[in-house]
Amino acid sequence: MHNFFAKKRMTAFLFILALATFSILNMIHSFEPLKKTLASADYRFSNAKGIINELDADINEHVFEKFGFVEAYGYLQSLMWKNEENNFEVVKDTEGKLHYTYFATGPTDTKELSDRVAELGAQLGSKTKLTYVMTPDKYVRGYTTFPEGIPYNYNNETADGFLDHLKQSGIDTLDLREGLLESGIPAKDLFFTTDHHWKIKTSFWAFGQLVQHLDGLYLKPLDPEHYFTDMNNYNVIPYKDFFIGSQGRKTGKLYAGDDDFDLIYPKFKTNYSFYFKTGETEATLNGRFEDALLTTYPLNVKGAAYDLTADKYFTYLYGNQGIVHVTNKDNPNGLKVMFIKDSLAVPMISFLSTVVSDVYLIDPRYYTGDIIDFAKKTDLDHVFVSISPQDLVDEFFPYGKNNVEGPFTSSK
């Protein structure tokens, strides 16, 4: 009997010791982020809930060996042949690609959102054209299938309804879901396995489709010799088994593997000015395409494969910035265009900069000014709205809802 209770006490002691050790390691690991949050906090009573939420987020984000636990959990799920993780937050299709999804009974009504785009068009000057560019969803119709029991979110059907409303309002549209399977890119290589974004080669194909669409709207073609839209005139640097995307960071690479990444940039001479501002952070860069429009930090960072700063997709245009202005100094008489966009469009816009004069990019999530007011005050030939099917939600269509003066005023 004595030995029985001794074993119990020893087990309890080891459990408490492990718990205490892990707690101490967690506190050490999260101390600096917690200290920073507390130092910048507004200690008014009305902000108490917000401070608690920030501290909770800091602790959850800086768990000791967090991604070791993620990998272990993902590996267990793979051993059980499971096609979903964390209550269907991330699911696998029959090809092994990861998806964000949720339970839905049908498409979402987006007429209010399409009406906002129509209002944007109505507010633009008579010389400024408006086009909605619908980028494809990772669930590619005619190719992607889910295993039995995996929910479908009706993103494509929602996008169909949204585009129908725009067409009824007389808005020009380009649906990049059309022709995707005829692009010459193998269907399995259109999107990353562990990320919701399309691959860089797919976005380059989309750039060509966009140029072709614009050639039908303007008397002077953007690329009459088909030089800038020819992949042979670009360097393609492959990185094998190099990228873990946003979905893979939730499951671990033992569950889904990792992705190859292609860095594509011009072989020909280029000369750019690149300005961006998000919040209090702003910068200006000048030089060739690869010097001004690309950041190699995500490609070179070591030991932080799961960190957001290592996201290879953000190599282009420094990811999602509130406001961006790209000037192609070699094409001063080209079109001046503006994109209201989400992250999917970023590489495509990077390539489009080779055939236009100026590109402005606004991310509605991070820009604090009035988007319509900015578009009206800026000398523009064309405004594009490019929000992907999964992002057809209120957050990406705040037009006219914010009357704060924009933090960036064009001199053009």
Where is each model-derived feature located?
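Extracellular glycan-modifying ectodomains
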Residues: 1-412
